[in-house]
Structures are given as structure tokens and as C-alpha cells.
Swiss-Prot record:
The lineage of its organism: Eukaryota, Metazoa, Chordata, Craniata, Vertebrata. Residues 1-57 are annotated as: Interaction with UBA3. This is NEDD8-conjugating enzyme Ubc12. GO terms for cellular component: cytosol; glutamatergic synapse; nucleoplasm; nucleus; postsynapse; presynapse. SMART domains: UBCc. One of its GO terms (molecular function) is NEDD8 transferase activity. The modification N-acetylmethionine is found at M1.
Amino acid sequence: MIKLFSLKQQKKEEESAGGTKGSSKKASAAQLRIQKDINELNLPKTCDISFSDPDDLLNFKLVICPDEGFYKSGKFVFSFKVGQGYPHDPPKVKCETMVYHPNIDLEGNVCLNILREDWKPVLTINSIIYGLQYLFLEPNPEDPLNKEAAEVLQNNRRLFEQNVQRSMRGGYIGSTYFERCLK
């Protein structure tokens, strides 16, 4: 009993001195779940994930380089911010690459049902990555954030394809300039 008391006392002294022998901070439910999600990732060959701080799994980047469809040969970067409410709340996902896409607006907001009303705690980071990849293979003009791009896709697929190619090469679509995003 005395040994246990002295260990507790020693730990208190170390913490008050600012030195801890290992992390005394407990991992949150969000951190534990994101660790599990990351460990179980099964990334498609068109995707890559990176962490600017390897100790911070709650903030990371995803790069998608589609190998087919309208966006073939493009390189699109997404930021993920996982809140403490995860997995009960979806992560915040933003597209950092300005893209001409019906489901991604010019500010980078993403219209993906599993990031909004269809989110369920059983969904994982892998589910979101596959959902984002699918948006590049099959843009959905029925649920748009960029209404202009959605209209063009519905009414003139050839013009939509030309606009996507022009935007990925770097150029103007109307009065909006798009940076080059070809890999």
C-alpha cells in the first residue's frame, strides 16, 4: 500500500515539474476511433493520405488522382478535420483544390450525403474516401453545390467535359479562374 502511495506521489511530482514519463493524457473516444479507422484503411490506388503532424490523427490531407472519367489525371487535395464528437458527428471535409464540379463549390464545400444527413457512427474514414472518389467518377447534378456546373452537366455533357479539362489545365470558366491541377 505504501509503495502505491509513493508511486502516486512520484507521478504528481513529475507532473507538477512539467515532466511526465510517457503520455499521462488519456485518448478521447474520437482519437481511439480515428486510430482504428486509420489502421484499417484500405486506400484505392488513386488515393493517398498524409499527416502534417504524425501525433495528430484528427487532422490530415487526402489526395485523389482519378484514373478515369471527366477528372482523369487531375490531382485534388482534401482536408479532414475530425472533431471530438466523432464517430457520432462526421468529420469536416473541404476540397483545397478549386475544382469545376457540381458537388463541390468554389469555396471547397463538398456535397456528399454521408457527410450530412446520411452520416452514421458505423461509417468510417474509408467510407468517406470511397464516397469522395465516387464523386469524381460519377458527378451528381441532382444534388449540386455548384448549380452552374450541374446545369451544364445535365444539358451539355460535351461542354461540361471541355469545362472540366480547361479548369484542370488552368484557365477561366466564365469569370472564375482555376489553378492548374493536373498531376
